Amino acid sequence: MSATWTLSPEPLPPSTGPPVGAGLDAEQRTVFAFVLCLLVVLVLLMVRCVRILLDPYSRMPASSWTDHKEALERGQFDYALV
């Protein structure tokens, strides 16, 4: 009744998981491309926001704050009803 354990020279059976070289199916590729596009848009928006925060007046057109406006356009309503 002695049990002897010996190692067999046979290789182990392959694992039951997905193969290592398996590609993505069509739905996974579509989702991956969509997420990648969203990340690119997010990075572009972050860069734009940082540039605006660092120099806010360079993005503003000069004509909106340097031209001379009439009194009613500036908000001065003194004697407007006369």
Curated annotation (Swiss-Prot):
The chain crosses the membrane at residues 30-50. This is Cortexin-1. Residues 1-21 are annotated as: Disordered. Pfam families: Cortexin. InterPro entries: Cortexin (IPR020066). May mediate extracellular or intracellular signaling of cortical neurons during forebrain development. It is found in: Membrane. It is a single-pass membrane protein. The lineage of its organism: Eukaryota, Metazoa, Chordata, Craniata, Vertebrata. Belongs to the cortexin family. Its main location: membrane. Keywords: Membrane, Transmembrane, Transmembrane helix.
